[in-house]
Amino acid sequence: MVMGVSLSPALGRWFRHAIPFAILTLLLLYISIWFFYEWPFPLPAQRTQQSGLRGLKLPSPSPVLGSLLSFPAGVQSCNPERPLPSQTGPAARPLVVPEKEELPCLGPHGALGRMVSPFLACMSPEGDVALSQYLAGWRELLRFLTPLGTVFAFATSEAFNKVTDLEARVHGPNASHYTSLMTMITWERGAGLLQRPGTEPGHSAGSSGSRTLLLLHRALRWSQLCLHRVATGTLGGPDAGTQCGEAYSTALAPHHPWLIRQAARLAILALPSRGRLLQLACPGTGEADARVALARAAGVLEDVYNRTQGLLAGHGLLQLA
C-alpha cells in the first residue's frame, strides 16, 4: 500500500526496485558532473591562461547540465566561448610552465657555477680538450677546494704549481702548440719530449706539458670522486672523510710514495662533516638542493676526466709519470 492506495504485488516489487535505482542514478549523475568540472581534460584548441583551471578552457554546459548547475537553458555560462579581453591582442601568449629556478651556487656568481662553466667549455665538439679553458676550470676548482679543509689544501698546493706551469706554456713562445691537448701531444711527441725518464738519453718527460697534465688529470679524478661521494652518500653511511679517503686510495695513492700517502691520510682526518661540506659548497640552500648541485658539478668533472682519459690512453701516455 502506497499513500493509502493498495498496489498489486508486481507493482509493489517494481517500486521497491525502481526507487533505489533512481537514487543511484541521481548519485552517479552528481558524481559525473563533479568529476567533469574538477578534472578538466586536455582540449588543445581551447587553451587559455587561466592557471586556476590548469590552463584549459571548459566548454559551456549543455542545457541539462546547465539546469543542474543553475544555468537555465539559453543563458550564457560562467565559461563563455569568447576569450576574455586579457586573452586577446598582442599580449596573448601560450601557457608556459616555469622551470625550477637554478640554484644560486650553480649560477655564474656561485662557486660551483664558476668552476663548471670553463670545464664545460673546454670540451670541444671535435672531441679535443681546450687547454686554456681546462686550466681556467682548474683555477676555479682550486679556489673552491682550498677552504674545504686541510686535505684539500694538501692536494691543491701541488696542483696550483702544475696549473701555473701549464699556463706558462699556453701563453709562452710555443703557445700555438699548446692550444689543446691534441696539439700539445702531437708537438711534444715530435719534439721528443714524451719519452719516459731513463728510456732515452738526453730526453725526459719531466719537462713536458703532457706529463704535467697527466698529474693534474689524476688529481681531477680524486676531486671528482670525493665530491660525488659527499653529494650522494647515504644517511648513516660512511662519513665524508672515509669516502674521500677511499677516493684518494683509488685515484692518487697508487702513484704516491709511502710518506706522501701517510701525510694524506692524516690530512683526511681533519675533513669537515658532510653537512659542513655541503654548506660550503652551496651556501644558503638546504641539504637536498646542495647535494643536487654538488652532484651536478661532480658529473661535469667526470665528463672532463673521461674525455682526457680517452685521449691520453689513445696516445699511450697514461704511464708517462
From Swiss-Prot:
* Record's GO cellular component terms: cytoplasm
Q: Name one Pfam family in it.
A: GLTP
Q: Which InterPro entries match?
A: GLTP_sf (IPR036497), Glycolipid_transfer_prot_dom (IPR014830)
Give the highest taxon in the source lineage: Eukaryota
Q: Between which residues do disulfide bridges form?
A: none
| Alphabetical list of Gene3D superfamilies matching this protein | Glycolipid transfer protein
Q: Which GO terms describe its molecular function?
A: lipid transfer activity
Regarding protein family, the annotation reads:
Belongs to the GLTP family.
User: What is this protein's record name?
Assistant: Glycolipid transfer protein domain-containing protein 2
Q: Which organism is it from?
A: Mus musculus
